[in-house]
Design a protein with these regions (language model features):
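A conserved ligand/cofactor-binding region detector
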Residues: 1-755
Length: 755
């Protein structure tokens, strides 16, 4: 590639010098540069192609990430600095795409980056949501959901002339396709994220300040929102319509491209492999069978055999509520043809395996999507060693007994290019100086461990944390209106709001810490506890947890005895951009889900990679982090997954009995303290109090005492900064296992077999 001269580009595009350009015009200049460089990259073009189908792709802003992958980041940054410009300020003009919500979508984005970086032929396939999940706003210490209008001026979407017809039960719709380029780091080639949209979509269905809309107008609303509210029958139907629209387009695209590459479709499995990312794309199985039989004259039995050899399924959850189940009658309404094929597949599964526990359609005429994936896919993987073992031993045990050869573990990973180079350039520079630059492509950080007792390296590592905290404080002041003390310990829990992730347990700790400070026990360093995450609009208790956190934040800020020592912040509309500011600044990584409930987690990996110490239960990938760094470099607490499973199995967990312990009762009852209730919403606080006291399904009260003790030990250990930074270095040095390049290599070697 020719050398870049931003000065020449500025003169050509705007007739002025680079120094004279404002940040907005420089942003436009950089977008054009990246587009041209990316357009010049040919597509990966192997015989066999991966289609990674996912309801979510939480891709984040792409300008800096793509410059890193295209190999022009340092050159561009240096020229901008020389001209008096700040790339981070320029990036603020980029709007973050709203195509995902949490870990599922961010994992998919990291995977696409790694697939391209390894030079593999593989595209992501999903939907182009006009308003995303929603934009989160806070008012009256409560979450308000408004449309996330991100599509206005989008420079990353490239129109594709492909269009398909999707036939529903009593009407049809037409799709249109847009692509996002995915260049590979250090590669001359690229892949794409293929996003299907509804040609007839009508944004006018959505009032400006509400996410409520007419769910019955399927031909106009299908691609408006990610995960539309499914708390009523029409919402559940809309979800099914949306999922079928996604997979029908994906299947038609896959077949067309396979034929273009030379397939006669009898050999389709030699040309295409599908990775189903969670159960949302499951209907691609019957849809591929339908297309092969009705459009391409392949016999049904052969079509089933073909599809069985080309579809793989990733399970992301242990929660029964998240293993999708749909009424057969609803599927029949959306697509009678697909429902008929599902009935036939169920008959095949029942003929092969009589155990009713593994039926696709149960005695209540409910279709279990994961069961279809397992019977008619050739691979099933979990996403952390513990998660996969739980699937094999308990949650999916009947299937594991039938198909042990199908099951494997593929521990999740993250792309180091974004989460070090992009998010924490000071740390990237330190790593380059100390261990060389190969870590960007190899993911190998292990050489850093040789410097665990090197005073100079530890001091430089501490300096990178100081710099990251300064960037985070600036972000919080400008974007969130919050001032964070420069000497604060930064304690962070950022993830989707859900009872199993136990934000409510951290809230109980905050109450304990507040009361402890009121009693005169002042910490040596102020502690800032940062939350971030959205609650599903229909998930009442999660909304109540947000309200408790925001009310605690206000209560503590207004108490002059406590405010100098304890601060609670909840980031409004937490997204990838916020993550890139907060994660590098964190001292403590809160990974406190109830053991056995978190499949893997990826924020735990990002925090570890950036030198935060993990405070965790032995759940998901936390188990693997603990094994890698050793007990002395991580802080674990809580009941084990086996203990938790036993409590569920015998029904012996008694929240009410634990509540009666004086120390616990004090914390829970603080929520309904009359003065505190007067600050918040009485109904929300009373409901959450009663739920924790009487139900506590995810056992916050089981672990709260040990959690408080362990957390206080973490805060005490922070005071020995030499020992703390040594632990941080050991964590970074052992994070290489969690490179998504490693994960994708494993997927390819053991599942996809792409050349």
């Amino acid at each position: 590639m020719p050398r870049i001269s931003l000065a020449e580009l500025a003169e050509q595009s705007f007739g002025t010098s680079l120094e004279q350009l404002d940040d907005r015009r420089i942003y436009k200049l950089l977008v054009k540069l990246v587009q041209e460089r990316s357009a010049a990259c040919p597509l990966n073009n192997g015989k066999k192609k991966l289609y990674y189908i996912s309801a979510e792709f939480l891709i984040g802003k792409l300008l800096i990430n793509n410059m890193i992958d295209l190999g022009i980041y340092d050159e561009v940054k240096d020229q901008l600095v020389a001209a008096g410009h700040d790339l981070n300020k320029i990036e603020e003009f980029e709007v973050e795409p709203s195509l995902g919500n949490g870990g599922l979508g961010r994992l998919a984005a990291c995977f696409l980056d790694s697939i391209a970086t390894l030079g593999l032929t593989g595209d992501g396939v999903g939907l182009n949501y006009h308003y995303g999940l929603f934009r989160q706003r806070f008012a009256d210490n409560q979450q308000k959901a408004v449309p996330d209008e991100w599509l206005g001026e989008q420079d990353i979407l490239i129109d594709d002339d492909r269009s398909y017809t999707v036939e529903f039960g009593d009407f049809a719709v037409t799709s249109k396709l847009v692509n996002i380029d995915v260049p590979g780091y250090g590669q001359p080639t690229k892949n794409r994220l293929r996003l299907f949209d509804l040609a007839s979509v009508d944004e006018g269905l959505v009032p400006g300040s509400s996410i409520d809309f007419d769910k019955t107008k399927i031909a106009k609303n299908l691609t408006l929102f990610l995960y539309p509210d499914d708390s009523d029958e029409q919402g559940r139907l809309l979800r099914i319509y949306q999922e079928y629209f996604m997979v029908s387009n994906a299947a038609q695209l896959l077949i067309d491209e396979a034929v273009e590459r030379g397939s006669n479709l009898h050999d389709l499995a030699d040309y295409a492999v599908v990775q189903i990312n969670d159960t949302h794309p499951t209907m691609v199985i019957p849809e591929l069978i339908r297309l092969l039989t009705t459009e391409h004259d392949i016999e049904f039995d052969e079509a089933v055999t073909i599809v069985r050899s080309m579809v793989a399924y990733t399970n992301h959850t242990i929660l029964a509520e998240a293993l999708e189940k749909w009424p057969l009658a609803s599927l029949q309404k959306v697509s009678p043809a697909i429902a008929d094929i599902i009935v036939k597949l169920d008959e095949i599964a029942k003929a092969e395996h009589g155990d009713p526990r593994v039926a696709i359609i149960d005695e209540y005429d409910t279709v279990h999507m994961a069961h279809m994936d397992i019977h008619f896919g050739f691979s099933i993987n979990g996403v952390a060693a513990l998660h996969t073992k739980i699937l094999e031993d308990t949650e999916l045990r009947p299937f594991y007994e039938i198909y042990p050869e199908k099951f494997s573990n593929k521990t999740n990973g993250i792309t180091f290019r974004r989460w070090i180079q992009g998010a924490n350039p000071a740390l990237a520079s330190l790593l380059d100086d100390v261990i060389g630059t190969d870590w960007r492509s190899t993911g190998d950080l292990s050489k850093l461990a040789e410097f665990a007792d090197d005073k100079d390296v530890l001091e430089r590592l501490a300096a990178t944390k100081v710099k990251a905290k300064a960037i985070m404080r600036q972000f919080m002041a400008l974007e969130q209106g919050v001032t964070i003390p420069s000497n604060a310990i930064i304690d962070v829990q950022v993830k989707r709001i859900h009872e199993y992730k136990r934000q409510q347990m951290l809230a109980l700790y905050i109450i304990w810490k507040y009361l402890d400070i009121k009693n005169g026990n002042r910490p040596k360093h102020p502690v800032t506890i940062i939350f971030g995450g959205k609650a599903a609009p229909a998930y009442t208790i999660a909304q109540d947890i947000i309200h408790l956190i925001l009310t605690l934040s206000q209560w503590i800020a207004n108490d002059p005895d406590v405010a100098p020592y304890l601060q609670v912040v909840m980031i409004e509309n937490y997204n990838v951009t916020a993550a890139e500011r907060v994660i590098p600044a964190a001292d403590i990584s809160e990974q406190i889900s109830l053991a056995s409930k978190e499949a893997s987690g990826t924020s735990n990996m990002k925090f570890m990679l950036n030198g935060a110490l993990t405070l965790c239960t032995l759940d998901g990938a936390n188990v693997e982090i603990a094994e890698l760094v050793g007990d002395e470099n991580i802080y674990t607490f809580g009941a084990s997954s086996k203990q938790v499973e036993q409590l569920y199995a015998d029904g012996s967990y008694n929240a009410g009995a634990l509540y009666l312990k004086p120390g616990i009762k004090l914390l829970v009852d603080f929520i309904t303290n009359p003065a505190f209730m007067a600050t918040g919403n009485t109904e929300r606080l009373q409901r959450l109090h009663d739920d924790i006291k009487g139900k506590d399904w995810f056992m916050a009260l089981l672990d709260i005492e040990e959690y408080i003790q362990t957390k206080e030990r973490v805060l005490a250990d922070y005071e020995d900064q030499d020992a703390w930074m040594r632990k941080a270095l050991i964590n970074i040095a052992n994070a290489g296992t969690f490179s998504s390049d490693r994960t994708i290599s494993q997927y390819n070697d053991e599942i996809w077999h792409l050349s």
